[in-house]
Amino acid sequence: VKDPEKLLRIAKEWGVETEGKDIYDLAHEMSDLAQEEYGKIRGYSRWLKRAPQHTQDLWHAAGIEPRAIDREVSCALHMTHMGNTSKPEALIRQALRNGLSDGWGGSMMGTEFSDVLFGTPKPIDTEANLGVMVAENVNIVVHGHDPSLSEMICEYADSKEMIDYAKSMGAKGITVSGVCCTSNEVAMRRGIPMAGNFLQQENVVLTGACEAIVVDVQCIFPALG
């Protein structure tokens, strides 16, 4: 837990008692509540209360308040299956509800708890270019959308054990750079340089400079397989 203050703020926002609790016990409790937000059967998304009151009132009047993140996706899939919902008003309402569950649910959840786990970003100097890879170093490029994997790679690549191992193999050190959204994650938290954007992921390999490009779950060109 890199940002315990933010965890405490979210807990207070969600009405969770924090007094006297170990920060990691609280983190596990909040994790359980956060996962319930994906499939709970009662109530509405906890994050909606962050919106201005007049916006909340508009959502309520229109009947588009998202209930749970995965629930709205499943509902939309069901409604658009053959022989189900045919009224355009109902389909549009569910589309709006589903969109809100994405932005005010899944996206906000991922952002807030990534900050809790890995630290809240702050302005930081970094570089962006294919030239950030260093010929004399072991070059590892992280790519994708899951910050958990890239954070662990950065953590271990910076360890004395791994740097000494790289040097024993003839390199001067280890350079971690990034591509696509994972690149932005490690750039804004660690200052890791950006080798390129989504469209440049194959170019990173074509340089011949990187020893490994590590991908996770999304935005991966088939050629990288």
Where are these regions (language model features)?
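Metallocofactor- and cofactor-centric catalytic cores in central/energy metabolism, strongly enriched
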Residues: 1-225
